[in-house]
């Protein structure tokens, strides 16, 4: 009897252990299940920063790398960073990201790193789904290959729509007073679902490393900015 009881106990323990480690289905995100990748997939290598990638834990630890917050890098540093890859990048875009980022309480300096990934250093070439004339800096509305995505009348409107989509993910509050809703997919997002940039992985883009890519690029921006001070 004791042997049978011991065997039963072991089997019961194994059963509950298996249940505790079983994978659980994630909550459905109505804005993130589409089979598409960032509009720009070419590696974003620095021309003279071999082995210069900073650990994510140094400047953007996963649990602390929040979408909401104040920008830490100025427009001049951002522009100098981008000009090394695209001399034609308009400084106005960086300034608008920081200005509107303050309005929405979003890290505009990180949002523009996401835009770099989506637009290929704002060149809109080599595979980006959106084009320069669309003023779409985040692949907004590109739900699958062949879909052109949303277009906006001005640079400011395009940046505003990008930040509004981030705001939808990171906050449950109403838009700031006086801000017109320009994001055509704002209502499709489960509000407050993503608090960190890493939470955008498999949501904003069906790419498990999407948040890491944003963080890595931001880390490189931080390193570049620090080296030029």
What is each stretch, according to the model?
Residues 8-16:
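Bacterial N-terminal signal peptides
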Residues 2-6, 18-229:
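Catalytic cores of secreted/periplasmic lytic hydrolases that degrade extracellular macromolecules
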